[in-house]
Swiss-Prot record:
Pathway: Cofactor biosynthesis; molybdopterin biosynthesis. GO terms for molecular function: cyclic pyranopterin monophosphate synthase activity. InterPro entries: MoaC (IPR023045), MoaC_bact/euk (IPR047594), MoaC_sf (IPR036522), MoCo_biosynth_MoaA/MoaC (IPR050105), Mopterin_CF_biosynth-C_dom (IPR002820). One of its GO terms (biological process) is Mo-molybdopterin cofactor biosynthetic process. It catalyses: (8S)-3',8-cyclo-7,8-dihydroguanosine 5'-triphosphate = cyclic pyranopterin phosphate + diphosphate. The keyword Lyase applies. Its EC number is 4.6.1.17. Keywords: Lyase, Molybdenum cofactor biosynthesis. It is an enzyme of class 4 (lyase). The keyword Lyase applies. This is Cyclic pyranopterin monophosphate synthase.
Length: 157
């Protein structure tokens, strides 16, 4: 397997995607944030002093996707045609999923992964006053379509 972000000397480089064809691309990512049951109840009931946690986390995740190339060194600045973030509240965790879409020369996996990561960090920030033991985990790519390398779907979680 070849690392495309390394040049012949083994040093980092940004891959040249100029000769690639534009294709429709989509990526789905997931993250979890574990917390106390009381914290989940406060989020569900809108009792956090900082505001509507999930609405702010949704906007934060979208903003994160848009800024991916600013924080991931070799990531291309791409046109994002859409990002959607969903939250599933469980007894002691929130499952975050993001779907990001583009039509371009390079994939959108990093934008989807950044979206769920920033959404989880936003939840942490908004809830840390009542629950310092929260754990962000299981950040992963679930599915990607489009591009030269083909489609990918995680078999199990």
């Amino acid at each position: 397997m070849e690392f495309t972000h390394l040049n012949e000397s083994g040093r980092a480089r940004m891959v040249d995607v100029g000769g690639k064809d534009d294709t429709n691309r989509e990526a789905t990512a997931r993250a979890c944030i574990k917390m106390n049951r009381e914290t989940i109840s406060m989020i569900r009931d809108g009792q956090m002093k900082k505001g509507d946690v999930l609405s702010v986390a949704q906007v934060g995740g979208i903003m994160g996707a848009k800024r991916t190339s600013d924080i991931i060194p070799m990531c291309h600045n791409i046109f994002i045609s859409g990002v959607d973030i969903e939250f599933k509240l469980h007894e002691e965790e929130i499952e975050i999923s993001a779907v990001a879409k583009t039509r371009g020369k390079t994939g959108i996996e990093m934008e989807a992964l950044t979206a769920v990561s920033v959404a989880a960090l936003t939840i942490y920030d908004m809830c840390k006053a009542v629950d310092k033991g929260m754990v962000i985990s299981d950040i992963m790519l679930i599915k990607k379509t489009g591009g030269k390398s083909g489609d990918y779907e995680r078999e199990s979680i």
